[in-house]
Amino acid sequence: GSEMCIRDRGAQSVNPDVKVSVVWTNTWYDPGKEVDATNTLIGQGCDILTHHTDSTAVPATAESRGVKVISYHSAMTKTAPKQLIGAVTHHWDEYYAHRIQALYDGKWKVEPVWGGAEMHMVRLSAITPDAPKSVVEDINSVYSKMEKKEFNVFSGPIVDNEGKVQIPEGKVADDKMLNTMNYFVKGVIGKVPTGK
């Protein structure tokens, strides 16, 4: 649910009435299922696609079908040169350099890591050159605030898609809450699968 929360809240910041549809592949990597999911969403009328899977199938299908896409993990500019409007990219290089140095210094310890903008581990890149300058400035401004921990997308109030306040005003979801998030936020259609 936390990935959907981020995407939906971002979309709602510019269009409060946005609706987000989800199709589950239940796997990190299955290009066939990813193509099917993409075509299902396009068939439902979705006008911008994104994914949380590991292949290039979603951007490739979006490119071939003429639908805008935000890629995940890497920019995939060669896969969707006309339809890519941006990419959520992951950068572990600085983190690994820090961890390796800690090992050399005898200071390494096992600990969970939820690295985001403040650690430069998650970035928005490959923003389409067609984006208005004001939009790019807004994106850069929000990211800068995230780097400085002046803005957190998981700050309340966060209301789920059934109208229940999950994170009240003035509160911020901690790692435990994010790791156990079993709801979608307002605007997302559907429910998080329970695995039953």
Set out the residue ranges of the language-model regions.
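Short, small-residue-biased leader/transition segments that mark boundaries at the very start
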Residues: G1-I6
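Extracytosolic ligand-binding ectodomains
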Residues: R9-V22, N26-G32, N39-I48, A60-V69, ...
